[in-house]
Amino acid sequence: MARISGIDLPKEKRVEIGLTYIYGIGLPTSQEILEATGVNPDTRVKDLSEEEVNAIRDYVNKNVKVEGDLRREIKLNIKRLVEIGSYRGIRHRRNLPVRGQKTKTNARTRKGPKRAIGGKKKK
């Protein structure tokens, strides 16, 4: 079983798809990695030789931010936006959509469940 960046890649999948199980690697990045290391994208993960796995592992460690490092960087970027008080930072702090979506009717995922507003009862 190939283990790259602390993630066990699924054995039966093609290498191209298997690499996408690592946080921070999508299909284009996966294809770039395989092209740079000279590994055939159609090879199954279980059929990879130890040299190919090591080549992929070395390339990922040197050239791609993945898993914990990437998550940490994203978290720090959001924290910086909140601290400097930018519009995006304020939206993050209030748990509202950050990218300009309307919030009058939608944005339920970001805002959470509806809260009932208590009002006067009619007699």
UniProtKB/Swiss-Prot annotation:
GO terms for molecular function: rRNA binding; structural constituent of ribosome; tRNA binding. GO terms for biological process: translation. SUPFAM superfamilies: S13-like H2TH domain (SSF46946). The keyword rRNA-binding applies. GO terms for cellular component: cytosol; small ribosomal subunit. Keywords: Ribonucleoprotein, Ribosomal protein, RNA-binding, rRNA-binding, tRNA-binding. Belongs to the universal ribosomal protein uS13 family. PANTHER family: 30S RIBOSOMAL PROTEIN S13/40S RIBOSOMAL PROTEIN S18, SMALL RIBOSOMAL SUBUNIT PROTEIN US13M. HAMAP family: Ribosomal_uS13 (MF_01315). This is Small ribosomal subunit protein uS13. It comes from Clostridium botulinum (strain Loch Maree / Type A3).
